[in-house]
């Protein structure tokens, strides 16, 4: 009868509402790729993924997960990964190794994950997270060259000597060179979808675009044995470039050469 149908519809609505609420009671948070949130220039083509779960109830147990990786943000946001999709049972959420199609150097990728609880309820997809690979092959650096300050004839500048603890250091000393600075102008005439800068310096450097320092790091890059390896730092400069003229600048420091 009509009354029974109303109660049936109401019961179904309550069940659907309860199931939807239960799925929202837990979610994936704190995503990490190679221990970092949205890392730039990772030095591996088999990155590892980790995450945590925020749940209303104590004692939450993850029973399964589904992880996707792709090169299109919109597709991953819609739950589609064209490079890798894995679904596995278990509570693993640390260091899940990538095992999909081969990744390429210097490209940006996107990933997301969702999990199930012990009752078989599934969380929403995690907000899309990104990572980019570094320049890991020698060919990727084929167009790069070292830039150095030219030695000037008057590079040896003499200044008056000083006394320290009443001991004369000398009549003359050699003053150090000023910090070398390099600049280059580029012209941007089309909309920029993505722009990366990979910068290295023997010693330390600071990188500038249009007069503003890029990044908040200090004493880049990491020290290394320059006879064996030289480190570099990746910067996402997509939002730094403007239409028209742009000025790129680098200021160098002695770094380990001053030790």
What is each PLM-predicted segment?
Residues 23-58, 128-141:
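Pro/Thr/Ser/Gly-rich low-complexity, intrinsically disordered linker/stalk tracts
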Residues 60-108, 114, 118-126, 139-152:
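Recognizes extended acidic, P/S/T-rich segments that occur
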Residues 43-44, 100, 105-106, 242-243:
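Surface-exposed loops/turns
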Residues 134-172, 251-259:
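An acidic-aromatic loop/edge-strand motif
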Residues 1-7:
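Positively charged n-region of N-terminal signal peptides that target proteins for export
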Residues 30, 48, 62-66, 194, ...:
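Exposed beta-strand and adjacent loop surfaces of beta-rich binding modules
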Residues 51, 89-90, 94-96, 107-112, ...:
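Accessory beta-strand-rich segments of carbohydrate-active enzymes
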């Amino acid at each position: 009868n009509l009354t029974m149908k109303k109660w049936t519809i109401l019961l179904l609505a309550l069940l659907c509402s309860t199931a939807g609420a239960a799925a929202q009671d837990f979610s994936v948070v704190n995503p990490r790729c190679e221990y970092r949130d949205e890392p730039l220039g990772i030095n591996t083509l088999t990155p590892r993924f980790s995450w945590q779960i925020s749940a209303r109830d104590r004692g939450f147990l993850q029973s399964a997960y589904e992880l996707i990786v792709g090169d299109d943000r919109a597709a991953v946001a819609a739950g589609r990964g064209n490079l890798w999709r894995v679904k596995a049972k278990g509570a693993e959420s640390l260091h899940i190794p990538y095992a999909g199609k081969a990744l390429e150097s210097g490209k940006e990728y996107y990933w997301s994950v969702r999990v199930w609880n012990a009752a078989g309820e599934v969380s929403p997809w995690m907000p899309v997270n990104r990572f980019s690979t570094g320049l890991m092959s020698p060919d990727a650096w084929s167009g790069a060259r070292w830039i150095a300050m030219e030695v000037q004839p008057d590079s040896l500048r003499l200044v008056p000597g000083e006394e320290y603890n009443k001991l004369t250091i000398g009549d003359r000393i050699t003053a150090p060179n000023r910090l070398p600075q390099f600049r280059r102008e580029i012209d941007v005439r089309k909309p920029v979808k993505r722009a990366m800068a990979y910068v290295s310096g023997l010693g330390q450097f600071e990188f500038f675009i249009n007069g503003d320092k890029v990044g908040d790091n200090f004493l880049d890059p990491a020290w290394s044995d320059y006879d064996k390896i030289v480190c570099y730092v990746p910067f996402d400069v997509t939002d730094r470039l403007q239409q028209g003229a742009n000025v790129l600048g680098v200021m160098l420091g002695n770094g380990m050469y001053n030790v």
